């Protein structure tokens, strides 16, 4: 069981925050128990703020049986009259009072929901059982007439500080000790959506990647909300047109939507033949996408879209009731975790490509042989690493820290020998150069002095020097 469903609050007392709203709903339901008929409640708030959880907990606390009609169902005039009309004034088979929930009434639009709003208003006027409507956007034009006949209760986003304790409690129960700093980042990233925060926590726990870098790589939450709503409709509905419409307005590329659906098929469908048929339609959608890119003919796009949405919706025999937590594709998490590794291999390939004068694609073919040499012949590996100018990080990526240390040591030893050899060569060269300079220097010619001057110098040498005495000064 997914964590959102596993740890979903069953009673009002278990729900975090929104104390004022909980009290308001309790007072409203108690009025009904005292045979008063107050206006229906229109719960308005962003996805994940707890609208569904509040209605379920309220029904559990007061022993009401829930009858739900949500966005994955056709909700035109006839269907609403058939399902909701009778339930609005009678008890269930078990004799319990009935609580009717019309989910996401702001999504009532198009031909499939024609006349739905007007029929809801008619039922509200004659209802004897409590009715709760939920919506994400109260200001949609389609809700103008509903706003006048309902008691509007606005639910805000849950504060980050209220989400952190929930995440801490779940992680401890699942046997994970996660730092509060990480939990706060997850909670803050969820933007007040408790359901999304729990989904992110479960996704990170599956890969055991509770480090700050991976947490910050989580996708934008606004994007998740739109995809989450779309795939929920695809998995819940059994109508071709509703399923096809669910993906029509998504901003995400079709490949991303396909990954989301593929990831969550086994979470929703339980029968082997349903899972098999759903994946078969997804694989056919993938073939059409391949043809789109190969032939640049985008007319095939609609077939891929129909197969991955309606094809998956119609793969089941019947609709699965209950709420399922849909997970973001694990491939996104794996890509995030391998980001550093992919960067490292790219650097290595660039260096091999540059030195060997080949493409990176061709260099990739040789990388396995290079790894083998480095792991089994350290001396040869050291020479290759010097040639390719690999850094410590490059060598560690290709081998491991122990082998990398050995190779780096050999590389340093070779550098020392090379430096000593170069030093000796330079010394020899300098000596040779000096000798050569001496040999090539021309001798200075002696200047011949006149004979008389020479004789005079000789006579001066022969005469004894006079001894200096005290008398010589007088």
UniProtKB/Swiss-Prot annotation:
GO terms for molecular function: ATP binding; ATP hydrolysis activity; DNA clamp loader activity. CDD domains: AAA, HLD_clamp_RFC. Keywords: ATP-binding, DNA replication, Nucleotide-binding. ATP binds at residues 45-52. Gene3D superfamilies: 1.10.8.60, P-loop containing nucleotide triphosphate hydrolases (3.40.50.300). Residues 415-468 have a biased composition (Basic and acidic residues). Residues 415-474 are annotated as: Disordered. GO terms for biological process: DNA replication. Heteromultimer composed of small subunits (RfcS) and large subunits (RfcL). Belongs to the activator 1 small subunits family. RfcL subfamily. Part of the RFC clamp loader complex which loads the PCNA sliding clamp onto DNA. This is Replication factor C large subunit. It comes from Methanococcus aeolicus (strain ATCC BAA-1280 / DSM 17508 / OCM 812 / Nankai-3).
């Amino acid at each position: 069981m997914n964590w959102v469903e596993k740890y979903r609050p069953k009673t009002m007392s278990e729900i975090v925050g929104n104390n004022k709203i909980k009290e308001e709903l309790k007072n409203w339901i108690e009025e009904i128990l005292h045979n008063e008929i107050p206006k229906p409640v229109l719960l308005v708030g962003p996805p994940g703020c707890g609208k569904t959880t509040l209605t379920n907990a309220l029904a559990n606390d007061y022993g009401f049986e829930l009858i739900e009609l949500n966005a994955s169902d056709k909700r035109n005039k006839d269907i609403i009259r058939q399902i909701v009309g009778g339930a609005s004034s009678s008890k269930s088979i078990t004799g319990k009072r009935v609580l009717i929930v019309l989910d996401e009434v702001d999504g009532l639009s198009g031909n499939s929901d024609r006349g739905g709003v007007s029929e809801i208003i008619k039922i509200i006027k004659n209802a004897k059982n409590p009715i709760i409507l939920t919506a994400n956007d109260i200001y949609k034009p389609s809700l103008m007439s509903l706003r006048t006949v309902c008691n509007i209760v606005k639910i805000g986003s849950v504060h980050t500080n209220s989400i952190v304790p929930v995440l801490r409690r779940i992680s401890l129960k699942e046997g994970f000790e996660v730092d509060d700093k990480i939990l706060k980042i997850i909670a803050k990233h969820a933007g007040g959506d408790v359901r999304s925060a729990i989904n992110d926590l479960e996704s990170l726990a599956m890969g055991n990647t509770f480090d700050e870098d991976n947490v910050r790589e989580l996708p934008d939450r606004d994007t998740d909300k739109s995809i989450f709503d779309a795939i929920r409709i695809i998995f819940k509905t059994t109508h071709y047109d509703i399923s096809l419409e669910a993906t029509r307005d998504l901003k995400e590329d079709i490949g991303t939507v396909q990954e989301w659906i593929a990831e969550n098929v086994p979470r929703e469908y339980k029968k082997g033949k349903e899972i098999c048929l759903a994946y078969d339609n997804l694989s056919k959608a993938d073939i059409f996408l391949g043809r789109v890119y190969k032939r640049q003919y985008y007319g095939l796009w609609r077939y891929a879209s129909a197969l991955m949405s309606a094809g998956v919706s119609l793969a089941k025999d019947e609709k699965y009731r209950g709420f399922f937590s849909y997970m973001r594709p694990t491939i996104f998490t794996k890509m995030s975790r391998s980001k550093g590794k992919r960067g490292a291999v790219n650097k290595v390939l660039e260096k091999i490509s540059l030195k060997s004068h080949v493409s990176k694609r061709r260099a990739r073919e040789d990388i396995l042989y290079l790894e083998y040499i480095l792991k089994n012949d350290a001396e040869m590996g050291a020479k290759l690493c010097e040639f390719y100018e690999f850094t410590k990080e490059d060598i560690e990526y290709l081998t491991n820290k122990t082998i990398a240390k050995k190779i780096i040591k050999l590389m340093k030893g070779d550098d020392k020998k090379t430096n000593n050899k170069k030093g000796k060569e330079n010394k020899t060269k300098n000596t040779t150069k000096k000798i050569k300079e001496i040999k090539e220097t021309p001798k200075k010619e002696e200047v011949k002095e006149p004979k008389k001057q020479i004789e005079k110098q000789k006579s001066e040498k022969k005469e004894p020097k006079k001894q200096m005495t005290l008398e010589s000064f007088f």
